[in-house]
């Protein structure tokens, strides 16, 4: 048996044709940088010419492979070293964001350059988002002016939909937050974003990436209060953002109070303990009595399995609400709170069809228990009711309202006789 390896035949004198897709010239980052910078310098700061140059160069240069280098140059003028400084011994260009005028109009023009480039080469979208995330982490390595320009540009790009609001995650970096860089950067960013759109559009974008409740995290833990956030951004000229965050915090607090109240009621905790908890939360979150009475009503009504039979549910409701009347009375010390409760009862009885005949009996119970008084009931009947089930509930209340009016007249008559 021959153990020697059989020599494979060779093809001599053959020339293989390179595949077309492999013919594209391969550049290393330095060569790529040289080509881009040379082309940018030749445009002479004409951003229309810059956009055309970038459009044409994508057919010759490997944008996909060197996206980071490309965006480094367009923002900072050259390749960035870790930390945000320009890499040593590299050539640079002044045709970039950091060398441009620090004003909104100039940044809007640069935003158009990025917009055209990414629309032309869609595959750059992901690389561009990664670049912006990186740049935000490098903020400490940039000058104040460079940060301001980047903030304005980012705000415009967010408004135009060129970036997802998820890039803002980089601003929650511990060191950036601790040194106040994140909060200051966010001022310029949100100003330009709101200038392009409005606070509702901004809120919608933040909500999509679950950041609508995280804005206070731009500050260190010891400053993460509504008061501090509101003052900081109001003083910076962003009152609408401050109000938005205040409202978000209030909404969050309402949900927490509602959840806790349901649990306390289900556990059968004493009214005094529930009252103390609610009053503490009102003070802590600056929540009005009118808001709290609605939450309290909803919590009390949601912790019961109601009878499906209309003739039985009223009796069940009266029995349940009777024991909670003293608790409700503690949070109807103002006429507006009483009116709010009346509207909540009206809406509840309309939305839950088995309660349609219960409305008047609930109101009478609360009147006798001093949860509701004459004036708000009469006001509700006259013109403060809502459209839901209006005709049914007004008819139910007709006799009781007449009785209230007569009682009021008799009281006034007795007062006059006494005088």
From Swiss-Prot:
The keyword Metal-binding does not apply. One of its GO terms (biological process) is regulation of translational initiation. The keyword Cytoplasm does not apply. Keywords: Activator, Transcription, Transcription regulation, Translation regulation. Residues 1-15 have a biased composition (Polar residues). GO terms for cellular component: cytoplasm; membrane. Pfam families: HEAT_5MP1_2 (PF25504), W2 (PF02020). Transmembrane segments: none annotated. It comes from the Eukaryota. Residues 247-414 form the W2 domain. InterPro entries: ARM-type_fold, eIF5-mimic_regulator, W2_BZW1/2, W2_domain. Residues 1-26 are annotated as: Disordered. Translation initiation regulator which may repress repeat-associated non-AUG (RAN) initiated translation probably by acting as a competitive inhibitor of eukaryotic translation initiation factor 5 (EIF5) function. Enhances histone H4 gene transcription but does not seem to bind DNA directly. Belongs to the BZW family. This is eIF5-mimic protein 2. It comes from Xenopus laevis. The gene is bzw1.
